[in-house]
């Protein structure tokens, strides 16, 4: 059995297939054979990263970790603390909201022409380190170098930032919306 979910991690109309691991080779071969007439091709993790960066999709292990709260990660729209019988961790999240957060995620367009932020680069404001890049890459559809970073909360709203990439500080502009298909028209096609 295969469960097909109309969701994906790349911001295009697509499907995730959930199945027993023992079926993967047969399923892959069947889909690849059927897709030949549509010019199906394989693509790898750099392509997936490029696509997810353009949609500002956060990644597990980079933007989303056990040490980062949903509030710090900018995931507020995905939970409701007013519901009865709320989720595990709701009380801790409520406490975090009430006490305030020290860091917040920012989505950045980086002014660079030959190298992109990948993760762990320092983020500067007024020549002081104020955060760290969690991931980044080049958006091939938008022709933009993009990155996520956690910075001090007070700098998360439009401040001028810089990212050190290969020993050079590069300007980074905080984006307030997704750079590719911000209204999710492709996903709703």
PLM feature segments, named:
Residues 1-189:
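Conserved, structured C-terminal
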């Amino acid at each position: 059995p295969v469960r097909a979910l109309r969701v994906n991690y790349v911001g295009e109309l697509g499907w995730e297939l959930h199945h027993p691991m023992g079926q993967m080779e047969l399923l892959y071969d069947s889909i690849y054979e059927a897709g030949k007439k549509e010019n199906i091709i394989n693509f790898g993790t750099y392509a997936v990263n490029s696509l997810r960066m353009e949609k500002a999709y956060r990644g597990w292990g980079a933007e989303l970790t056990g040490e980062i709260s949903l509030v710090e990660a900018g995931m507020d729209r995905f939970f409701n603390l007013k519901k009865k019988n709320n989720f595990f961790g709701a009380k801790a999240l409520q406490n975090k909201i009430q006490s305030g957060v020290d860091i917040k995620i920012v989505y950045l367009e980086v002014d660079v022409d030959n190298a992109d932020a990948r993760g762990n680069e320092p983020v500067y404001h007024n020549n002081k380190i104020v955060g760290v890049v969690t991931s980044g890459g080049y958006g091939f559809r938008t022709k933009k170098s993009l990155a996520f970073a956690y910075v001090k909360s007070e700098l998360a709203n439009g401040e001028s930032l810089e990212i050190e990439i290969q020993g050079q500080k590069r300007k980074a502009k905080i984006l307030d919306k997704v750079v590719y298909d911000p209204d999710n028209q492709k996903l709703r096609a």
